[in-house]
Regions:
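Metallo-beta-lactamase
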Residues: 34, 41-43, 137-230
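A structural signal for the main folded, soluble domain(s) of proteins
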Residues: 46, 75, 80-82, 207-211, ...
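Short Pro/Gly-enriched beta-strand edge/turn motifs at strand-loop
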Residues: 7-13, 109-113, 134-136
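Active-site HxH/HxHxD metal-binding segment of metal-dependent hydrolases
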Residues: 43-46, 50-133
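C-terminal regulatory/interaction regions
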Residues: 236-309
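Divalent metal-coordination and catalytic microenvironments
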Residues: 28, 38, 68, 80, ...
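Aromatic/hydrophobic pocket-lining residues that form the small-molecule binding cavity
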Residues: 74, 188-189, 286
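Conserved beta-strand hairpin/beta-sheet module of binuclear metal-dependent hydrolase folds
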Residues: 2-56, 152-164, 169
Length: 309
């Protein structure tokens, strides 16, 4: 973890750049209160709490906001709610009922084979609304594509965008609806068009460093999107490898046999194999995905053990 300091940010805003297992967290402070945007993955919940406590220097955290409810963005919610009993939590409206009833299927945690402790919410982050955090007005914009219920946050006075997983410097997040066979590439394109219209000068992505060069990031994202739209199998293989790599990031090291036992029980991986497995059995197809990760340097395989790399 490191604080993103390569780009100048307004006072009152702190970015905790986390990596790829946990999404970045953004802390906004002013005289009225302290707001945190996104809370990372459950494995890092103690670190998330420690970072927030250190930055707040004894003042309470008043509000927790989630851009969307993938496990790497809200896995620290429960720990923060436990430590700060008066904390309010706002989520985008699309999955409010799923959170109320804690449906791990609807929330994607079972389909992805990931973990997220149950949390509650007090309010909804409605697209079209504006909120004042960190002495800045933040507009909430719907940003479907990567996740149908995701939002992005834009402060027009400073031309500052929290883009979540709709835009990174090197692309964008897996288009999860497509993994389920739901067309969503057009929504990704529309969200990229929205970001272009907002024309931010500084972008705080869900993963990776804060950056300022919007045009090349959009060009790269659109190029990747075109490739995926023209060849959905390419996106499916990418999505499968992301799911496998994410779990390797979580575990660090695991036997290939145990990893295979986990992978064969992951619904998304089974669905992708059924649609794009080219007639191979599931174990063979998963071995192919692991071999591609190994060739790219994302995993090391030795003596029956998998090591995250």
């Amino acid at each position: 973890m490191n604080l993103s300091e390569s780009c100048s940010l307004p006072s009152g805003i702190t970015v905790f750049e986390r990596g790829w297992l946990s999404a970045n967290n953004v802390l906004l402070q002013d005289a009225e209160g302290a707001t945190l945007v996104d809370s990372g993955y459950v494995k890092h919940q103690a670190q998330t709490l420690a970072l927030v406590q250190h930055a707040l220097q004894g003042r309470p955290l008043d509000l927790l906001v989630n851009t969307h409810l993938h496990s790497d963005h809200c896995g620290g919610n429960q720990a923060l709610q436990t430590h700060y009993p008066d904390l309010h939590t706002w989520i985008p409206p699309g999955l409010a009922q799923a959170v109320q009833h804690w449906s791990e299927d609807a929330l994607s945690y079972k389909p992805t084979g990931q973990n997220c402790p149950a949390f509650h919410f007090n309010g909804l982050l409605q697209p079209g609304s504006t909120h004042r955090w960190g002495d800045m007005d933040w507009q909430v914009h719907a940003a479907p594509g990567h996740d149908p219920h995701s939002v992005i946050l834009f402060a027009p006075e400073h031309r500052l965008l929290m883009s979540a997983d709709a835009l990174w410097q090197n692309g964008f997040g897996v288009v999860f609806p497509e993994l389920e066979g739901v067309d969503a590439f057009d929504e990704v394109a529309q969200t990229l068009d929205l970001i272009e219209r907002l024309n931010p000068a500084t972008i705080i992505p869900g993963h990776g460093a804060v950056f300022t060069e919007l045009a090349p990031a959009l060009a790269l994202a659109r190029s990747k999107l075109e490739g995926f739209a023209q060849n959905p199998e390419r996106h499916a293989r990418y999505g499968a490898k992301v799911l496998l790599k994410f779990k390797l990031l979580e575990w660090g090291q695991i036997s290939k046999a145990d990893f295979g036992d986990w992978a064969t029980r992951v619904p998304y991986l089974n669905q992708l194999h059924q649609r794009f497995g080219q007639g191979l059995d599931l174990d063979t197809w998963l071995d192919m995905m692991l071999a591609e990760l190994e060739r790219s340097g994302a995993v090391q395989v030795e003596d029956g053990m998998l090591q995250d790399a």
